[in-house]
Amino acid sequence: MLSSSFERNLHQPLLFIDKDTRVVIQGIGNQGQYHSRLMREYGTKVVGAVHPKKAGKIIAGLPIFKNMKEVVKRTDANASLIFVPAPGAAAACIEAAEAGMGLVVCITEHIPQHDMIKVKKVMKETGCQLIGPNCPGLIQPGTHTKLGIIPTNIFRNGKIGIVSRSGTLTYEAAYATTQAGLGQSTVVGIGGDPFAGQLHTDVIKRFAADPQTEGIILIGEIGGTSEEDAAEWIAKTKLTQEKPVVAFIAGATAPPGKRMGHAGAIVSGGKGTAEGKYKALEAAGVRIARHPGNMGKFIFEEMKRLGKI
């Protein structure tokens, strides 16, 4: 039987987070402590952390709880940020979902793919939204809320939604849209692993429904079909007639069979190429930026073309 906290926490904001998001940290080591402090300085409501051997203590200004069920009961948390090392990260994701979290953001890299299959099954069963793993997290400048390791100084409240498989290219797009005076509504780093919790289409659907988001930047990588699937949805809904979309795909020069950075960034069997992704996106009406330095310029031009600025 579902707990009342589970039922309550399923009612998550359209763009995953808002000013009322209450965050618990799983994995309060050096990185967890450091980034939880930065999140609180930015304005995020971080309400506690979980460590089974340190329950009852205060670490980095946060009360420590034995497990996720206890922290939900005591703090009314509705989102979890995971810094647990790879061997235990999948179990941490599952514990968070089963405790009633509406959102789990997993920063951890190198989680075994077999473990992630189990995690995705639990997420589907519980209705919990997973972002990551192997991702920088997400940020919402208008509410001063972020979960993850994203640096805050380049972000400004504004009109552009950014969804990206690459952390550093996310920051490039954010800086460019800030410099162009457009700012960002919400920025989501979905991560580069083969079994990601959110794919491009999942996030773009939310941007399409969000009134503050007036334009979208999609940053992809070689490998997988997330970008092609997004192109299909964009074409079917004629999204670019209402909200412009600009896309950049990383890894265009990668030789077949060579992994480029992320575990999912690999071309195999002739599928997952940058050119194939560009072709699908362009056919859907998406403006293609073949150099990351053009992302800000092109979204500004597209916004102007549609009379949004």
Curated annotation (Swiss-Prot):
The active site is at H262 (tele-phosphohistidine intermediate). The keyword Transport does not apply. Keywords: Hydrogenosome, Ligase, Nucleotide-binding, Transit peptide, Tricarboxylic acid cycle. Residues 1-9 form a transit peptide. It is an enzyme of class 6 (ligase). One of its GO terms (molecular function) is nucleotide binding. InterPro entries: Cit_synth/succinyl-CoA_lig_AS, Citrt_syn/SCS-alpha_CS, CoA-bd, CoA_lig_alpha, NAD(P)-bd_dom_sf, SUCC_ACL_C, Succinyl-CoA_synth-like. Belongs to the succinate/malate CoA ligase alpha subunit family. This is Succinate--CoA ligase [ADP-forming] subunit alpha-2, mitochondrial. It comes from Trichomonas vaginalis. The gene is ALPHA-SCS2.
